[in-house]
Curated annotation (Swiss-Prot):
The gene is rpl34. It holds the Pfam family Ribosomal_L34. GO terms for biological process: translation. Residues 1-21 are annotated as: Disordered. Disulfide bonds: none annotated. One of its GO terms (molecular function) is structural constituent of ribosome. Belongs to the bacterial ribosomal protein bL34 family. Coiled coil: none annotated. Keywords: Chloroplast, Plastid, Ribonucleoprotein, Ribosomal protein. One of its GO terms (cellular component) is ribonucleoprotein complex. It comes from Cyanidium caldarium (Red alga). It is found in: Plastid, Chloroplast. This is Large ribosomal subunit protein bL34c. InterPro entries: Ribosomal_bL34. Residues 10-19 have a biased composition (Basic residues).
Amino acid sequence: MIQRTLTGTNRKKTKRSGFRSRMLQTEEEKLLILDVMKKRYYLVK
């Protein structure tokens, strides 16, 4: 749900703001991946 709204806003905004929001989106994705990895490690333990 969150990713859909972010991509929708990116299309409406200008290239600069779109690039900036794109960077933020990648940061959020990295955090989500880290959370998933941590959960997997806890499950393994």
